[in-house]
Amino acid sequence: MQRLRWLRDWKSSGRGLTAAKEPGARSSPLQAMRILQLILLALATGLVGGETRIIKGFECKPHSQPWQAALFEKTRLLCGATLIAPRWLLTAAHCLKPRYIVHLGQHNLQKEEGCEQTRTATESFPHPGFNNSLPNKDHRNDIMLVKMASPVSITWAVRPLTLSSRCVTAGTSCLISGWGSTSSPQLRLPHTLRCANITIIEHQKCENAYPGNITDTMVCASVQEGGKDSCQGDSGGPLVCNQSLQGIISWGQDPCAITRKPGVYTKVCKYVDWIQETMKNN
């Protein structure tokens, strides 16, 4: 678990990749060596929870995903998220932090585009069934609501995505999006939002790919020949099918985009009642 947490905490900076540290922490050659060891161990395990990347996708048409949000901790991109109401975001529970800076309405994270909105958020509601003590071992109920301090203004560039209690079936074409790395195992972090078209696969094939790790609240998606996937770098982002939110990017295989090893998503249709009740009570 700890080694995967270290892998998740790597980030992008203007000079390349640096290891994220808690405020006040100091690095040392010994710590740097330990970080490298943990990363190599995490890669060796194969299964990776957390931050995802869009592999072999394409640059999204600017502002074509107006529900897409980016969760930052200060200047560090933590996860993706989906706007589902003026004050509410849906993301993965393993993205839990005490405070976020939320960026919406952006395509290029390094440019001011005139339509972006920024909010803070300190209230998070992970699903009560999520095992936060084992965030990279137990992937069940990997879903969380985040309440922003103030509502966003609904514009052409910032707009909520519809939820649906009707689950999609195998063969449905869907879209994933995020700002994570565009290659695996090497990390190449884009500035602009990336998209990929993928397809929902049969539940039995999903179980066969990850024996003992798949529940009925998870859904798998990929392309049959491999090559397109979500993986480390931007967890919590949306899986959009038929213009509704059907999945939250959760976990999968590393290296990513391997044939017969699809990405695994939290099946949002199974949680609509919990989402609505949590928003109503808070």
UniProtKB/Swiss-Prot annotation:
Disulfide bonds join 60-195, 79-95, 167-269, 174-241, 206-220, 231-256. InterPro entries: Peptidase_S1_PA, Peptidase_S1_PA_chymotrypsin, Peptidase_S1A, Trypsin_dom, TRYPSIN_HIS, TRYPSIN_SER. Residues 1-50 form the signal peptide. Its EC number is 3.4.21.-. It holds the Pfam family Trypsin. Residues 53-280 form the Peptidase S1 domain. Keywords: Disease variant, Disulfide bond, Glycoprotein, Golgi apparatus, Hydrolase, Ichthyosis, Protease, Secreted, Serine protease, Signal, Zymogen. Glycans are attached at residues 131, 197, 213, 242. About 40% of KLK11 is inactivated by internal cleavage after Arg-188. This proteolytic inactivation may be effected by plasminogen. GO terms for molecular function: serine-type endopeptidase activity; serine-type peptidase activity. Possible multifunctional protease. Efficiently cleaves 'bz-Phe-Arg-4-methylcoumaryl-7-amide', a kallikrein substrate, and weakly cleaves other substrates for kallikrein and trypsin. Cleaves synthetic peptides after arginine but not lysine residues. It is linked to Ichthyosis with erythrokeratoderma: An autosomal dominant genodermatosis characterized by early-onset ichthyosiform erythroderma with excessive skin scaling and peeling, and erythematous hyperkeratotic plaques. Lesions are present at birth or appear soon after. This is Kallikrein-11. It comes from Homo sapiens (Human).
